[in-house]
Swiss-Prot record:
Binding site for ATP: K197, E314, G340, G341, D342, T343
Protein keywords: ATP-binding, Cytoplasm, Glycolysis, Kinase, Nucleotide-binding, Transferase
Claim: Flavoprotein is one of the keywords in the record: no
Protein family (similarity comment): Belongs to the phosphoglycerate kinase family.
Reactions catalysed: (2R)-3-phosphoglycerate + ATP = (2R)-3-phospho-glyceroyl phosphate + ADP
Protein name: Phosphoglycerate kinase
Subunit-level organization: Monomer.
Cellular localization per UniProt: Cytoplasm
EC number in record: 2.7.2.3
Xref: Gene3D superfamilies: Phosphoglycerate kinase, N-terminal domain
Gene name linked to the record: pgk
GO molecular function: ADP binding; ATP binding; phosphoglycerate kinase activity
GO biological process: gluconeogenesis; glycolytic process
Amino acid sequence: MSVIKMTDLDLAGKRVFIRADLNVPVKDGKVTSDARIRASLPTIELALKQGAKVMVTSHLGRPTEGEYNEEFSLLPVVNYLKDKLSNPVRLVKDYLDGVEVAEGELVVLENVRFNKGEKKDDEALSKKYAALCDVFVMDAFGTAHRAQASTHGIGKFADVACAGPLLAEELDALGKALKEPARPMVAIVGGSKVSTKLTVLDSLSKIADQLIVGGGIANTFVAAQGHNVGKSLYEADLVEEAKRLLTTCDIPVPTDVRVATEFSETATATLKSVNDIKDEEQILDLGDVSAQKLADILKNAKTILWNGPVGVFEFPNFRKGTEIVANAIADSDAFSIAGGGDTLAAIDLFGISDKISYISTGGGAFLEFVEGKVLPAVAMLEERAKK
C-alpha cells in the first residue's frame, strides 16, 4: 500500500483536519465504551505535539442528515477528551465557512452527519472541508469503506491527504493476518446487522476453514432449518441464501437458545431447544450447549476473526453466550483479530482486551477488507500519493 503517512510530514504551524472514528456508544451524556477514542488519541496527541492547529471530527450515530440533533452531538466525546488531554479542547458547531484554531489547541468539529451532503460525498461540501486545512489526515478505518465527504471527498481537494497512524497500523495488521493465516482459521460473524453480513459469509467461506454465526444472523439460519423463530430478528428474504450456505459450508446452527417475550433489559430469559420456540418469543442469546460447542471449535483455532456478539449481551440475562465465546477467544493460542463497535463493547465488558492479538476499530470496513474489497478512502489516499 503506497500512501503518504502523517508520520512522514512536518505539521508545525499547519492546519490539520483529522477524520477520526469517534462513533462511540453514549448513554445519559456519557461515553460508555471508549475503545475508539483511546485508539485515536495517539494521532491527535502527535499532531498537537508537533505544533499543528488541530481539528478533529467524526460521525456519531445516525441522525437525520442536515439537521442538528443534540442526542448525536460530539459533546460527550469532547468532555472525555478534556479529561485525557492537557491541551484546551473546544467543540465548534458551525464551521463550514471557516474556523480559527490556535496552535496547541484541539478543536472538535461537530458531527459531520449534521452537514447536508456528507453521506453522498457531495463535492461542494468536500471542498468546504478541504478549505479548512492544509493537511487532511484520514485516520478512521471504521468508515474507510464509505465514500463520504469527510472520509473521501475532502481528500481529493485538500493540499495534502495522508493516512493517520491508526489507519496505517490497521491496514498493516489486517494485511498480515489475511495474507498467510495460520490454520485452522475461524471466522465469527454476529451482531444485529443481518443483511449486510450474510453476503459477507459467502466470501469468508472461501478464506476461513470454519464459519461461526451468532445474533440476528444465526436466527436466519435457525429459520432456514425450518424452525419457528417467533418474533426474533431475522431476514425472511435471505432464508434461501442461508439454506444454500448450509449446503456448501460447515456452519454450526444453534440447537438451544435463550428467549424472551419482550426486548428489554429486565426481560426474563428462558432456555429452550430451537424446536420449541413459540410465536410470541424472540431469540436473544445462544443456549449453553450451543455456546460451548463454539468454544470447543475456537479452542483448536490458529487464527480467529471476530466480528459481532452472539447475543444481546447488553442485557445481563442474555450475556452468557457472548461471554462464553469471548472467553474462549481470550484463552485461545490463536492470533485473534476483533472488529466492530459491539464487539469492542463486549471486549470492554468482559475485560479481555489484553488477550486479543489485534483490536480493529472497523466494523463494516473490517469485513470488507477481509473480503478483499477496495476501500474508497484508501484508494483515494493511494491516488493522492501519486501526485
